[in-house]
Amino acid sequence: GVMVQYPGDGGRIIDYRNLVQVLHSRGIPVAVAADIMSLVLLVPPGQWGADVVVGSTQRFGVPMNFGGPHAAYFAVREMYKRYMPGRIIGVTVDREGGKALRMALQTREQHIKRERATSNICTAQALLASMAGMYAVYHGPDGLKRIASRINQYANALRDKIIELGFDETNNDFFDTLRIRIPASLSVEKIKSFAVEEGINFRYFTDQTIGISI
């Protein structure tokens, strides 16, 4: 199989339709890791042939929480529904060096009494899923479109100002992420130092470009 990101890693929106057609003609399924907020405005992956779509629901009203926890979403075509795993059994080695099987991934990992549990991060994903779901219900389709459109408008306003300042924005099509090319005359390290002082978190690529997400 093949997995692609939508929008791409650097923020660019890529039209994968031709790629998906070629892959499907060779019997290769396509999975997509997609930003759920961008899907409010973009053509859904299922409409251009994706077989599996996954991603995080954090952007639907869930705080960053220093990186987690956040609930995920996982969607497949009808033909793959029975292949969605409830539990995945992995191969490992026991203490005597022999081959052993163990549960490597499952939807619920707590098999001890609540009083003895030291964490509840796995089963607590239901709370995050409920928060994201109710965020969508509360705002409704029109409200979500207004939110996503406002994010995109902010990104476009920032892009216009950056171009006005003489910088090159390399993402022709984007939702909320810009990739700015820094001239050789400017030091990326100086920009990074200034950004840290101002509490601004940029992404620094190795090709003299900087990523900015709204």
Predicted regions span which residues?
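Conserved PLP-enzyme active-site core in the AAT-like
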Residues: 1-100, 162-166, 175, 179-182, ...
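Residue-level recognition of alpha-helix initiation/capping sites
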Residues: 13-14, 36, 127, 142, ...
